[in-house]
């Protein structure tokens, strides 16, 4: 095609990572790091799983080799909006001997990708994952109920003891919590018994906050402690840890070789940025920024210095400070032709941050994910249940539904009218 935009998109699509064919050459960035586009996560090599277009791709290790990879809005076709719409979806992946992320199979049972959480999907309702984590062999996932992207009604946390085939709800939080600044999160386990979470709104307009909690409190965010960098105290009131020239989008926090690594899409700079610090409890405005993907025109060749409409940014398990793999999303919102998660490789962050990589400890050992038999035999069903932390309105609705369930005929006749009034977490529980 003579259309420069189509040519640019074809250039990206030809990053055939699995065979190391047409992978981009490493690009020297202004700060001295080197960034290489390794290739798209999906392509001809993954057609068998029934998913052709997707974004995000948050990851958590399952063992020393495989990792869970969870995506947002996904489609069976090869462009945004083409084919069946599913969210969230997941695959099991690993990194091959050449350093490429390779999809092995769907996370759910069966040979085709399905929604990980079962719910009635109508209108603009969608469930977008924030992050996934492996704690002592149990997977935990936090996701946001959106009535149209950016319009978060509430968030929910699930757990899985079947390597992601089946999920059970354990916690529900209204978006009034932290004034919405706790909707979008990324979490990581520290070495001190706490799990730490960075958070912001899902509007790409606000700063970054820091929380911590014990595992037994993961389902009750009112028990999470909030950090104030001005006082260096943990209380029930938060202040931003990162706010200067920042409008936080998707984030990923990981503890790697004794350092806290934060990857983030920053809408203020229209770039995917990396920040690394040996201390988490600090003012992150003082941490130097390393850009790994900068927005640019679709009419120009796609590269780390011109990656049109980027977002996301998720660290691949097994990454090290001096060899960091990050999955970056890209969506051409004008044509919807280009909608994909793509692997980037970053070298030289150790030098940029003054870290002697030869002195770094090995990566933390991975506790193998539990692989218990699933009760439903269908990972697509999600196995979800209502949170024990329902608010009063939800409890009231549950009571009403119970009465309606006892009057089967009336319930059937009334269904079209009361279904729309139910909150997403109740629809998910009832699978309607």
Which role does the model predict for each range below?
Residues 401-417:
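A cross-kingdom C-terminal cell-surface attachment/processing module
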Residues 53-62, 121-136, 180-193, 247-256, ...:
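Structural signature of eukaryotic scaffold interfaces centered on beta-propeller domains
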Residues 375-401:
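Extracellular Ser/Thr-rich, low-complexity/disordered mucin-like segments
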Residues 3, 7-50, 61-123, 134-178, ...:
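Beta-rich carbohydrate-recognition and catalytic domains
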């Amino acid at each position: 095609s003579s259309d420069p935009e189509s040519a640019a998109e074809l250039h990206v699509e030809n990053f055939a990572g699995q065979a190391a064919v047409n992978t981009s050459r490493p690009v020297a960035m202004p700060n001295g790091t080197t960034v290489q586009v390794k290739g798209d996560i999906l392509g001809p090599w993954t057609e068998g799983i029934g998913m052709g277009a997707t974004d995000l791709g948050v990851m958590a290790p399952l063992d020393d080799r495989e990792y869970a990879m969870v995506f947002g809005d996904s489609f069976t076709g090869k462009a945004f909006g083409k084919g069946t719409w599913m969210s969230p979806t997941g695959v099991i992946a690993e990194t091959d001997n050449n350093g490429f992320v390779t999809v092995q199979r769907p996370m759910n049972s069966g040979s085709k990708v399905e929604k990980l959480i079962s719910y009635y999907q109508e209108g603009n309702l969608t469930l977008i994952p924030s992050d996934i984590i492996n704690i002592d062999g149990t997977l935990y996932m936090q996701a946001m109920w959106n009535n149209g992207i950016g319009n978060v009604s509430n968030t929910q946390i699930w757990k899985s003891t079947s390597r992601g085939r089946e999920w059970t709800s354990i916690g529900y939080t209204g978006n009034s919590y932290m004034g919405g600044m706790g909707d979008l999160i990324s979490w990581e386990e520290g070495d001190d018994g706490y799990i730490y979470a960075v958070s912001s709104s899902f509007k790409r307009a606000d700063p970054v906050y820091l929380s911590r909690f014990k595992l037994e409190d993961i389902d009750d965010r009112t028990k999470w402690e909030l950090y104030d960098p001005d006082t260096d105290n943990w209380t029930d009131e938060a202040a931003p840890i990162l706010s200067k020239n920042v409008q936080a989008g998707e984030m990923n926090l990981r503890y790697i070789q004794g350092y806290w690594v934060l990857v983030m899409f920053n809408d203020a700079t229209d770039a995917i940025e990396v920040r690394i610090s040996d201390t988490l409890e600090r003012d992150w405005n003082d941490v130097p920024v390393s850009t790994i993907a900068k927005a640019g025109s679709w009419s120009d060749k796609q590269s780390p210095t011109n990656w049109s409409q980027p977002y996301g940014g998720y660290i691949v398990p097994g990454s090290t400070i001096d060899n960091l793999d990050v999955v970056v999303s890209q969506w051409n919102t004008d044509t919807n032709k280009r909608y994909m998660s793509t692997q980037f490789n970053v070298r030289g962050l150790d030098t940029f941050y003054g870290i002697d990589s030869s002195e770094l400890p090995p990566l933390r050992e991975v506790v193998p994910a539990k692989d218990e038999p699933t009760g439903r035999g269908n990972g697509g069903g999600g196995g979800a249940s209502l949170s024990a932390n329902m608010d009063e309105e939800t409890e009231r609705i549950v009571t009403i539904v119970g009465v309606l369930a006892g009057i089967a005929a009336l319930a059937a006749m009334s269904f079209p009218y009361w279904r729309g009034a139910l909150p997403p977490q109740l629809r998910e529980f009832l699978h309607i």
